[in-house]
């Protein structure tokens, strides 16, 4: 118990029987979790109210002194059940519209990473950086086969090459595909964007803590769809520059 209290254990990978979000690492994901919690509050409130009304109707139906066949209309209750749901929907809609706009907005990114989906692996390009040969940094990332996994590596999640990003840096991901539709999704970063052939989609992320984040292709793309993991290592700026010099 003391270990759990004194050490923050963050969840950046899928867990067995998980029923909630992974721990967030970007403002976008924080907003998604907050919106989810707010909507769940209204859903639980509505569920309890409707359940209580249904229980009361069934329980007291035989005690009703006014038979329902003589009840021709109820203007007050009709106004209530028309206006109240509309108000609840508006309360839910406005925050969701704001969050949707913020998630799509990309303003002055510090760097750009291009992710291209192929059957069944990812290719990444760092177009802002050029190596000694005058070429942009690019590499391919494949899932590590189960028989080659080392201790501590995750089945169908670890890759032979990782995307490396600096912490606290505004990063733009440009996502596309070379064959069929894929989907670039990292839950902890609040990223989920379709990778479509012939189209460039973009999303931004401000990753606020170092760590290793896992994602998957979230669009059925063929027989090896489950073998398209995404692994992102977030390091300090100094470590990122060291990694760049090694490429």
From Swiss-Prot:
Annotated binding of Cu cation A1, by residue: 182, 217, 221, 228
Catalytic activity, EC: 7.1.1.9
GO cellular component: mitochondrial inner membrane
PROSITE patterns on file: COX2, COX2_CUA, COX2_TM
Membrane topology, Mitochondrial intermembrane segments: 12-38, 102-247
Family: Belongs to the cytochrome c oxidase subunit 2 family.
Protein known as: Cytochrome c oxidase subunit 2
Topology class, membrane: Multi-pass membrane protein
Oligomeric and partner information: Component of the cytochrome c oxidase (complex IV, CIV), a multisubunit enzyme composed of a catalytic core of 3 subunits and several supernumerary subunits. The complex exists as a monomer or a dimer and forms supercomplexes (SCs) in the inner mitochondrial membrane with ubiquinol-cytochrome c oxidoreductase (cytochrome b-c1 complex, complex III, CIII).
Reactions performed catalytically: 4 Fe(II)-[cytochrome c] + O2 + 8 H(+)(in) = 4 Fe(III)-[cytochrome c] + 2 H2O + 4 H(+)(out)
């Amino acid at each position: 118990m003391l270990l759990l209290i004194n050490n923050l254990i963050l969840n950046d990978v899928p867990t067995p029987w998980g029923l909630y979000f992974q721990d967030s690492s970007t403002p976008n994901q924080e907003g998604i979790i907050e919106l989810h919690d707010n909507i769940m509050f209204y859903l639980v409130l509505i569920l309890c109210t409707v359940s209580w009304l249904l229980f009361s109707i069934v329980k007291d139906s035989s005690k009703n002194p006014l038979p329902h066949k003589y009840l021709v209309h109820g203007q007050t209750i009709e106004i209530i059940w028309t206006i109240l749901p509309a108000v609840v929907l508006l309360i839910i809609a406005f925050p969701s519209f704001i969050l949707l706009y913020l998630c799509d907005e990309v303003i002055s990114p510090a760097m750009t990473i291009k992710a291209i989906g192929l059957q069944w692996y990812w290719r990444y390009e760092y177009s802002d950086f050029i190596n000694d040969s005058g070429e942009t940094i690019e590499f391919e990332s494949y899932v590590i086969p189960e028989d080659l996994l080392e201790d501590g590596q995750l089945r169908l999640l670890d890759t032979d090459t990782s995307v490396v990003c600096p912490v606290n840096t505004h990063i733009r991901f440009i996502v596309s595909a070379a064959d069929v539709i894929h989907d670039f999704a990292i839950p902890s970063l609040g990223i989920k964007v379709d990778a479509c052939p012939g189209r460039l989609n973009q999303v931004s992320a401000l990753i606020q803590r170092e760590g290793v984040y896992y994602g998957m292709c979230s669009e059925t793309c063929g027989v090896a769809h489950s073998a398209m993991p995404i692994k992102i290592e977030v390091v300090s700026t100094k470590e990122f520059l060291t990694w760049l010099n090694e490429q």
